[in-house]
Design a protein with these regions (language model features):
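Vicinal oxygen chelate
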Residues: 1, 4-13, 43-46, 64-141, 149-152
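N-terminal beta-strand motif that seeds the catalytic metal site of vicinal oxygen chelate
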Residues: 1-17, 73-75, 130-135, 152
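Core segments of cupin and vicinal oxygen chelate
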Residues: 11-58
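Short coil/turn motifs at beta-sheet boundaries
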Residues: 38, 68-70, 107-109
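A short, sequence-level motif marking secondary-structure junctions
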Residues: 56-61, 131
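A short, acidic/glycine-rich surface segment
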Residues: 59-64, 100, 104
Protein backbone atom coordinates (compact mmCIF):
# COMPACT_ATOMS: atom_id res chain seq x y z
CA UNK A 1 0.00 0.00 0.00
CA UNK A 2 1.19 3.55 -0.76
CA UNK A 3 1.86 5.60 2.39
CA UNK A 4 3.43 8.87 1.21
CA UNK A 5 5.37 10.68 -1.51
CA UNK A 6 9.17 10.51 -1.28
CA UNK A 7 9.99 12.97 -4.08
CA UNK A 8 8.73 14.40 -7.32
CA UNK A 9 10.69 15.52 -10.37
CA UNK A 10 10.49 19.04 -11.73
CA UNK A 11 11.68 19.65 -15.28
CA UNK A 12 13.23 23.11 -15.55
CA UNK A 13 14.22 25.14 -18.60
CA UNK A 14 16.76 27.14 -16.55
CA UNK A 15 18.11 25.40 -13.44
CA UNK A 16 19.68 28.57 -12.01
CA UNK A 17 16.39 30.53 -12.15
CA UNK A 18 14.48 27.55 -10.76
CA UNK A 19 16.93 27.10 -7.88
CA UNK A 20 16.82 30.84 -7.09
CA UNK A 21 13.01 30.83 -6.94
CA UNK A 22 12.62 27.72 -4.79
CA UNK A 23 15.56 28.48 -2.48
CA UNK A 24 15.68 32.28 -2.24
CA UNK A 25 11.93 32.92 -2.39
CA UNK A 26 10.28 29.78 -1.01
CA UNK A 27 13.07 28.90 1.43
CA UNK A 28 13.94 25.39 0.24
CA UNK A 29 17.47 24.03 0.54
CA UNK A 30 19.56 23.03 -2.47
CA UNK A 31 21.18 19.62 -2.18
CA UNK A 32 23.53 17.79 -4.55
CA UNK A 33 23.31 14.01 -4.66
CA UNK A 34 24.89 11.17 -6.59
CA UNK A 35 22.53 8.41 -7.73
CA UNK A 36 23.23 4.90 -6.40
CA UNK A 37 24.39 3.85 -9.89
CA UNK A 38 27.24 6.36 -9.59
CA UNK A 39 25.91 8.54 -12.39
CA UNK A 40 26.16 12.29 -12.79
CA UNK A 41 25.72 14.48 -9.69
CA UNK A 42 22.17 15.78 -9.56
CA UNK A 43 20.37 18.60 -7.75
CA UNK A 44 17.33 18.50 -5.51
CA UNK A 45 15.32 20.95 -3.44
CA UNK A 46 14.72 19.83 0.16
CA UNK A 47 11.91 20.99 2.43
CA UNK A 48 10.49 19.19 5.45
CA UNK A 49 10.69 15.44 4.80
CA UNK A 50 10.29 15.83 1.05
CA UNK A 51 12.38 16.75 -1.93
CA UNK A 52 12.01 17.80 -5.53
CA UNK A 53 14.58 16.35 -7.91
CA UNK A 54 15.49 18.73 -10.72
CA UNK A 55 15.84 17.71 -14.36
CA UNK A 56 17.16 20.02 -17.05
CA UNK A 57 14.56 20.22 -19.84
CA UNK A 58 17.36 20.10 -22.43
CA UNK A 59 18.84 16.86 -21.06
CA UNK A 60 16.65 15.07 -18.49
CA UNK A 61 18.12 12.19 -16.53
CA UNK A 62 16.93 8.67 -17.36
CA UNK A 63 14.54 7.24 -16.66
CA UNK A 64 12.24 10.21 -17.03
CA UNK A 65 8.60 11.01 -17.72
CA UNK A 66 7.30 10.12 -21.18
CA UNK A 67 7.05 13.79 -22.15
CA UNK A 68 9.28 15.80 -19.77
CA UNK A 69 8.33 19.44 -20.25
CA UNK A 70 8.74 22.51 -18.11
CA UNK A 71 5.71 24.50 -17.00
CA UNK A 72 3.26 21.60 -16.65
CA UNK A 73 3.25 21.24 -12.84
CA UNK A 74 0.51 22.37 -10.46
CA UNK A 75 1.61 21.75 -6.88
CA UNK A 76 0.51 22.85 -3.41
CA UNK A 77 3.03 23.44 -0.61
CA UNK A 78 2.00 23.73 3.04
CA UNK A 79 3.64 26.49 5.06
CA UNK A 80 3.68 27.74 8.63
CA UNK A 81 3.86 31.36 7.42
CA UNK A 82 0.73 33.49 7.21
CA UNK A 83 -0.76 34.62 3.91
CA UNK A 84 0.25 38.18 4.82
CA UNK A 85 3.88 37.07 5.22
CA UNK A 86 3.78 35.32 1.84
CA UNK A 87 2.16 38.35 0.25
CA UNK A 88 5.09 40.44 1.52
CA UNK A 89 7.67 37.91 0.30
CA UNK A 90 6.15 37.80 -3.18
CA UNK A 91 5.83 41.59 -3.28
CA UNK A 92 9.50 42.05 -2.25
CA UNK A 93 10.55 39.63 -5.00
CA UNK A 94 8.26 41.22 -7.61
CA UNK A 95 6.30 37.99 -8.06
CA UNK A 96 2.70 38.49 -9.12
CA UNK A 97 0.04 36.75 -7.04
CA UNK A 98 -2.28 35.07 -9.50
CA UNK A 99 -5.04 34.34 -7.00
CA UNK A 100 -5.72 34.51 -3.30
CA UNK A 101 -5.72 34.38 -0.52
CA UNK A 102 -8.62 31.99 -0.98
CA UNK A 103 -10.04 29.14 1.08
CA UNK A 104 -9.55 25.71 -0.47
CA UNK A 105 -9.79 22.10 0.60
CA UNK A 106 -6.46 20.35 1.09
CA UNK A 107 -5.62 16.70 1.73
CA UNK A 108 -6.15 17.07 5.50
CA UNK A 109 -8.83 19.76 5.63
CA UNK A 110 -9.40 23.45 4.95
CA UNK A 111 -6.47 25.57 3.78
CA UNK A 112 -5.90 29.21 2.92
CA UNK A 113 -3.95 29.59 -0.33
CA UNK A 114 -2.05 32.01 -2.56
CA UNK A 115 -1.18 31.13 -6.17
CA UNK A 116 1.96 32.25 -8.01
CA UNK A 117 4.02 31.05 -10.98
CA UNK A 118 7.60 29.82 -10.88
CA UNK A 119 10.13 30.79 -13.61
CA UNK A 120 8.75 28.04 -15.92
CA UNK A 121 5.15 29.16 -15.24
CA UNK A 122 4.31 26.10 -13.14
CA UNK A 123 1.36 26.90 -10.88
CA UNK A 124 2.58 27.09 -7.29
CA UNK A 125 0.02 27.10 -4.48
CA UNK A 126 1.30 28.20 -1.08
CA UNK A 127 -1.08 27.17 1.69
CA UNK A 128 -1.56 27.29 5.41
CA UNK A 129 -3.84 24.93 7.29
CA UNK A 130 -7.00 26.81 8.18
CA UNK A 131 -8.50 25.98 11.55
CA UNK A 132 -11.85 27.34 12.59
CA UNK A 133 -11.70 28.17 16.27
CA UNK A 134 -14.79 28.27 18.45
CA UNK A 135 -14.39 32.04 18.70
CA UNK A 136 -14.21 32.35 14.90
CA UNK A 137 -17.31 30.19 14.44
CA UNK A 138 -19.21 32.13 17.13
CA UNK A 139 -18.18 35.43 15.55
CA UNK A 140 -19.46 34.22 12.15
CA UNK A 141 -22.77 33.11 13.66
CA UNK A 142 -23.20 36.49 15.37
CA UNK A 143 -22.46 38.36 12.14
CA UNK A 144 -24.94 36.23 10.19
CA UNK A 145 -27.58 36.74 12.90
CA UNK A 146 -27.00 40.50 12.91
CA UNK A 147 -27.23 40.59 9.11
CA UNK A 148 -30.51 38.64 9.17
CA UNK A 149 -31.90 41.10 11.73
CA UNK A 150 -30.79 43.98 9.50
CA UNK A 151 -32.65 42.45 6.54
CA UNK A 152 -35.82 41.77 8.54
Amino acid sequence: MISSIDHIVLTASDLDKTIAFYCDVLGMTLEDFTPSDGGEVRKSLKFGNQKINLHNAKSPFKPHANNPVSGAVDICFLSSKTMEEWNNIFSENKIEIEDGPVRKTGATGPIMSLYVRDPDLNLIEISKLFFLTKACILDSILKISAFKLFLA
